[in-house]
């Protein structure tokens, strides 16, 4: 049996205050899609609007009015996993935080345990950023000293 996503009316959508509705062209575009979609749209309707930027489509639907909270959380986990695929050796705390989120979604851990995993992942991100910045600063200083004639 196919599930049905909630639909949002044009009036409800305007309460989200889309920034592109601030100019005449953006407002015309919204009114065009209101007519095209019959005054209501669900997340899939909006995600399939190819002439709307990816950023605007995601901004529009990544909210509980369009998508159930559990799916939004799972989507966040998948985005985080995709980002970690770009890192040669991701910090285990980041990987564990994603798993903790899924455990929380299944009711296997408490909100406090999830918060602890999130804090550990945040520490990992800061550690990585600090290390990268420090390496960059060392290289910058070496290059500056070389530019100034110091071998």
Predicted regions and their residues:
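Short, glycine-biased loop/turn motifs at secondary-structure junctions and
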Residues: 1-151
């Amino acid at each position: 049996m196919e599930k049905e996503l909630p639909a949002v009316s044009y009036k409800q959508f305007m309460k989200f205050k889309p920034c592109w509705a601030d100019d005449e062209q953006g407002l015309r575009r919204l009114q065009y899609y209101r007519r095209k979609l019959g005054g209501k749209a669900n997340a899939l309707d909006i995600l399939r609007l190819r002439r709307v930027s990816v950023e605007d489509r995601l901004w529009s639907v990544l909210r509980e009015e369009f998508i159930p909270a559990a799916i939004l959380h799972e989507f966040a986990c998948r985005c985080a996993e995709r980002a970690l695929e770009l890192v040669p050796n991701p910090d285990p705390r980041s990987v564990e935080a994603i798993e903790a989120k899924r455990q929380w979604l299944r009711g296997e851990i408490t909100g406090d345990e999830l918060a602890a995993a999130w804090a550990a992942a945040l520490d990992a991100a800061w550690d990585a950023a600090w290390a990268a910045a420090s390496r960059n600063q060392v290289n910058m200083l070496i290059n500056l000293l070389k530019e100034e004639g110091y071998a």
